Amino acid sequence: MNRTKIVLATSNKGKVKEMADVLSAFGFEVIAQSEFGLVSPPETGLTFVENALLKARYASKMTGLPAIADDSGLAVDALAGAPGLYSARYAGIEDDDTANRRKLLAEMQNVPDGQRAAKFVSCIVMLKHETDPTPKIAFGECFGEILREERGQNGFGYDALFFYPAKQCTFAELDSTEKKQISHRALALVALQKQL
């Protein structure tokens, strides 16, 4: 089978691991942007869509390949949707998962049980080329709640704090195969596949 090469526009190793197998099953030969020596551009957009488009356009421009990018985050009801767009740098340092979780726990300290609802949101964008005027855009959401302490060793980001009621565990307590089937990113990838 002739597989289409596509650059995965993320520097997040957790996202690469989570997305590459799924995209490969869709018939793509996935090449992480790190293999080209690229890092993601600054996320200056005001929405998940804008940030995903920025990343995909940059990766496509720099590699000459079609690109796929994800922008995702955790939106907590009691925090008016925060950390939201700033999930990866919530504590002020890019991709410091431990610091981000600590800050979230500190901000949620006085939020009572029953008012700790949250959702993971993923926006995935696919471009055929840098100036593609009709990008494919897909969304996925997973609903849960924020625990008072971390549980589980798997995953990344806020997974150890995100309790998923449908499985009665945190995302960090799921094995990678199970998470790839039910996560917000998995749901967005399935929605994207329907557009291909």
Swiss-Prot record:
Record key words, sorted: Hydrolase, Magnesium, Metal-binding, Nucleotide metabolism, Nucleotide-binding
EC number of the protein: 3.6.1.66
Active site: D71
Database matches in Gene3D superfamilies: 3.90.950.10
A single GO BP: purine nucleoside triphosphate catabolic process
InterPro entries assigned to the protein according to its UniProt record, in alphabetical order: dITP/XTP_pyrophosphatase (IPR020922), ITPase-like_fam (IPR029001), RdgB/HAM1 (IPR002637)
Cofactor note: Binds 1 Mg(2+) ion per subunit.
HAMAP family reported for this sequence: Non_canon_purine_NTPase
Protein name: dITP/XTP pyrophosphatase
The organism of origin for this protein: Haemophilus ducreyi (strain 35000HP / ATCC 700724)
